[in-house]
A protein has these predicted regions:
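Polytopic alpha-helical membrane proteins, predominantly small-molecule transporters/carriers
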Residues: 1-105
Length: 105
């Protein structure tokens, strides 16, 4: 069950940077802040549950890896963030690292 909690925590980790991005626009400032806080709390709570069965270092690395890769993809797909082959290689390395940590557990 810990890995399910951790996967969900990582996916929710993507929500708070999106909320902060929303908060940069005056019309959606408070909505964005609310989204960011709610996603932070939910993600943190699920990370807490995951750490009951997964070592802290592994859980934190996987959590941040999912969040970083997911936020990168959201930024590219919805916010027009710049891309390059090297940036995609970097994200692929993060994903490979997360997969390796899961296999090593």
């Amino acid at each position: 069950m810990g890995w399910i909690y951790l996967l969900l925590a990582g996916l929710l980790e993507i929500g708070w940077p999106v909320g902060l991005k929303m908060a940069q626009v005056p019309e959606t400032r408070w909505t964005g802040i609310t989204v960011a806080v709610l996603f932070m709390c939910a993600s943190g709570a699920l990370l807490f549950l995951a750490q009951k069965t997964i070592p802290i270092g592994t859980a934190y690395a996987v959590w941040t890896g999912i969040g970083a890769a997911g936020t990168f993809l959201v930024g590219v797909m919805y916010y027009g963030d710049p891309t390059s082959l090297l940036r995609y290689v970097g994200v692929a390395l993060i994903v490979a690292g997360v997969a390796t940590l899961q296999l090593a557990h």
